Regions:
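Short beta-turn/strand-loop junction motif enriched in small, turn-promoting residues
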Residues: 78-81, 224, 271
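Acidic/histidine-rich catalytic neighborhood
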Residues: 85-93, 333-335, 349, 353-356, ...
């Protein structure tokens, strides 16, 4: 239960007593468990896995690494309990040691097993055979090598070492979320719902918006698609729309100076697969169509890297959740990219092919005729 659901009195009480763990009731119990354990004692809990990775629990992870240890963990993931189906509830069973030690904890990665019975059998097999492929040994203090200190027990020493020598993606491209309208039903539409003459496709700067057009292309994320596409939405962003949105409690006009700039974009919700696309200038972006803004020289190389399995592997270390937010992506390590000219040519080809595919069907505002004709 998140802190926002605790109620005013209880929320304040928990925040005062569990300053590193108050964001969720289950993490407050983790902290309380240390207080109830004897020195060198243990506490064991089944909790949501969110504390292992999310930025809001970074202080709790830091406290565990500084003052305590993880003796063992069965990382259950989703579908750990037959009575709770679906992909939403992700859990972990952890034995915490109330002492700082250098003993490597035992970790059982059961997240890829799809039922309670499979996870039970997998745990028993790992106990009998440490070479099974889902058993790991790791010292909790080693997680501090990764930005945000996620409990990425499966990370190799080589992978963790990259973070110390590489430049972060955030330094090169400044990823960020965009505008929250406060009322998408009124202010974000599909482009075919509006008169095409009332949509501006060529605006390059907020201050130079035309006064005679109300709608502008808007990157709003969308389904899995690499390189180019998901260009379906427009946002009302003329002066009258902005003035109306300002009256809405949910309106958040963030990063206005980046609107209409060329960007790399992706969807906040990924279903486990990341896909990154090139957006030329002329587009707005909202809070779920997150975007990054590298310079022209590094644009294609960074887009190429983001669409690789290597980037996906590092993203799973940083945030193995259904969300791919700007803060997590900013932590991706970027090493020097060799063969830049070849990469640029290949990326241009990928964008060209995917654009041709997107424009071949009626969802594209650039559609002219079906490719079979």
């Amino acid at each position: 239960m998140g802190s926002s659901s605790l109620g005013k009195w209880m929320g304040a009480w928990v925040k005062k007593r569990y300053t590193e763990a108050y964001r969720d009731l289950c993490t407050s119990f983790i902290d309380r468990g240390f207080g109830m354990s004897a020195n060198n004692g243990y506490s064991a809990m089944v909790t949501m896995q969110s504390w292992m990775f999310l930025g809001s629990f970074e202080k709790l992870r830091g406290k565990i690494m500084r003052n305590h240890s993880i003796s063992s963990m069965a990382h259950l993931g989703t579908r750990a309990f037959g009575a709770i189906g679906g992909e939403v509830v992700s859990t972990t069973a952890t034995v915490f040691a109330n002492a700082k030690n250098e003993v490597k904890g035992a970790y059982f990665r059961l997240v890829d097993m799809v039922s309670e019975e499979e996870k039970q059998a997998g745990l028993l097999e790992a106990l009998a055979n440490h070479e099974c492929g889902w058993f790991y040994r790791a010292n909790a203090s080693g997680f501090e090598a990764i930005p945000g200190s996620p409990i990425a027990y499966w990370a190799s020493n080589a992978a963790m070492g990259v973070f110390s020598s590489a430049v972060s993606f955030g330094e090169l491209a400044n990823p960020s979320a965009g505008i929250t309208t406060g009322d998408n039903a009124s202010y974000i539409h599909y482009w075919w719902e509006e008169e095409i003459s009332n949509i501006s496709f060529t605006t390059n700067d907020f201050s130079s918006r035309p006064t005679d057009q109300k709608w502008f292309p808007c990157n709003k994320g969308g389904a899995f698609r690499k390189w180019y596409g998901n260009r379906e939405n427009v946002m009302a962003f003329d002066d009258s729309a902005i003035n109306a949105m300002r009256k809405l409690p949910g309106y958040r006009p963030v990063n206005i100076e980046k609107q209409f700039k060329a960007s790399i974009s992706w969807s906040d919700i990924t279903s486990g697969r990341n896909s990154f696309r090139a957006n030329g200038s002329g587009n707005l972006y909202d809070h779920v169509g997150i975007s990054a803004f590298p310079d022209e020289e590094s644009f294609n190389c960074l887009l190429a890297f983001l669409n690789t399995s290597v980037a996906s592997t590092f993203m799973i270390l940083l945030a193995p959740t259904l969300h791919c937010n700007a803060g997590d992506l900013a932590k991706l390590p970027i090493v020097e990219i060799k063969e830049k000219n070849s990469v640029n040519e290949l990326v241009n080809d990928c964008i060209k092919l995917c654009r041709r595919d997107w424009d071949a069907f009626e969802l594209s505002w650039a559609f002219r005729y079906h490719p079979m004709i």
